[in-house]
């Protein structure tokens, strides 16, 4: 059984390079809590001998169809409603969806993977302003809009209250703002050593495929 967790399990306050032995930390809201609870449940099942499990913690998965990192940002940028906290200097750890799926498949099949936790992310990181810059280029807009984390949190909190009153979902929640201001990245040496996995898709090629998908689905206007 493969449990799809997330790098958010490490919490948003940790800094530097984190491997799978780094303590988890519930400081990112309900999303983080659900990931930690599910990890606890499957590890308990493994310890009890009920089932063999593997936990994978994906990085910031992007590519065609990605709601949080392709679709939602494009929609917000088109409406001039997108801003980056930490002046765009937060760390983004992009992993293309095909590389992620390949890593999950290897984790499910490898005989030495049972009971293990694997980070499936890129090697290193990039600034959030560099990740989102192509989105602006695709739409023919200048940006990204870079603000302090404090200001971004204020705006996000207000937007969330308005969205709740109207029965809508605010995808740029305070938790998302905090996530985009983090200063951590993730070691993938364990996945390389045990699974023989590492990312193959270059960022430029991954974004080009994402752009084509976005254009084909009417997200880039006429």
Question: What are the residue ranges of the model-derived segments?
Answer:
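NAD(P)-dependent short-chain dehydrogenase/reductase
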Residues: 45-92, 97-98, 135
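Glycine-rich Rossmann NAD(P)(H)-binding loop
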Residues: 63, 85-90, 118-125, 136-139, ...
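Conserved C-terminal active-site "lid" loop/helix of NAD(P)H-dependent oxidoreductases
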Residues: 97, 133, 157-198
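Conserved Rossmann-fold NAD(P)-dependent oxidoreductase catalytic core, especially the SDR/UDP-sugar
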Residues: 1-30
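Glycine/proline-rich active-site loop of Rossmann-fold NAD(P)-dependent oxidoreductases
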Residues: 36, 49-51, 62-72, 98, ...
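Mid/C-terminal beta-alpha module of Rossmann-like enzyme folds, strongest
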Residues: 106-172, 204, 208-211, 222
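Amphipathic terminal alpha-helices
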Residues: 186-193, 198, 202-222
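Active-site Tyr-X1-5-Lys
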Residues: 12, 28-54
């Amino acid at each position: 059984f493969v449990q799809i967790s997330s790098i958010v399990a490490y919490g948003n306050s940790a800094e530097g390079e984190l491997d799978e032995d780094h303590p988890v930390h519930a400081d990112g809201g309900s999303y983080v809590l659900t990931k930690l609870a599910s990890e606890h449940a499957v590890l308990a099942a493994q310890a009890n001998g009920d089932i063999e499990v593997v936990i994978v913690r994906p990085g910031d998965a992007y590519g065609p169809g990605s709601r949080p990192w392709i679709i939602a940002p494009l929609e917000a940028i088109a409406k001039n409603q997108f801003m980056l906290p930490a002046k765009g200097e937060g760390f983004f750890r992009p992993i293309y969806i095909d590389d992620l799926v390949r890593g999950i498949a290897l984790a499910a099949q490898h005989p030495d993977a049972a009971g293990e936790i694997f980070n499936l992310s890129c090697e290193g990181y990039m600034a959030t302003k560099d990740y989102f810059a192509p989105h602006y280029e695709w739409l023919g807009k200048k940006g990204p809009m870079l603000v302090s984390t404090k200001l971004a949190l204020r705006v996000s909190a207000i937007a969330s209250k308005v969205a709740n009153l109207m029965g809508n979902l605010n995808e740029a929640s305070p938790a998302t703002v905090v996530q985009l201001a983090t200063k951590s990245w993730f070691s993938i040496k364990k996945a390389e050593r045990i699974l023989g996995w590492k990312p193959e898709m270059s960022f430029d090629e991954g974004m080009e495929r994402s752009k084509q998908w976005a254009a084909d689905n009417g997200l880039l206007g006429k």
